[in-house]
Amino acid sequence: MFLKSEDIEGKLTHWISKDHAEKALNGEFEFAGGGLHSKPIGLWLSWNSGWEDWTSSEWPAWMERKICLQAKLKPGLKLWHIDTFEDFIRVWNEFKTFANIKEENTYMSMISLYDSKKKGIDFWDWLKEKKVDGVALTDEGQWATRMKTWLYGWDAACIVVFDPKNVELK
C-alpha cells in the first residue's frame, strides 16, 4: 500500500518543454492549476518508460516539443503504491468523505471528488496531511484501476511527487 522512495526500482524520467528545462534543472518549477481534480499538482515522472510507451502510440506529436530528463527520488519519501485495485480502494476508503465506496461504484466517486473540492475538502491535501509524499502507479495498477476509478486519465505507469524539491533532475 505504501512504499519508501528507495524501494522504487526502474527508470524514472521527466518530460518537459524545452523552454522550461533549464529552470527545472535549477529547481525552479511552475505548475499550472490542476485542471482535473483527479490529477494532483506535483512533479510527474514516467516510470519504466510508461509515459514514453503510451505517447509513442497514442500521441506521438507530444514528444516532439519536449526533452527527457533523468529523475531520482530523494530517500525517505512515502509513496502511495497502487499495484492493484485493492491498493487503491484501501486508501480511498480511509478518506472520510468517501468511506465504504464499493468496487461497482468507484468511478462515480469522481463526482464526489469534485463536490468535496468545492466544499473545501481535498483528497490530495488529506494525503499530504497523512505524510504521503506522492503516488506511485504501476503498469498493473493502471490497468486494474483504469475503468473502475478516476485514475482513468493517468494513462501509464507513473509517479507524481507533490513537492518537486524531493526529486533530483539531470
Regions found by a protein language model. Give the residues of each.
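Active-site and NAD+-binding cores of ADP-ribose-processing enzymes
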Residues: F2-A32, L36-H37, W59-K170
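Aromatic- and glycine-enriched beta-alpha-beta binding-site module
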Residues: L43-K66
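Beta-sheet entry/capping signal
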Residues: G42-L43, G134
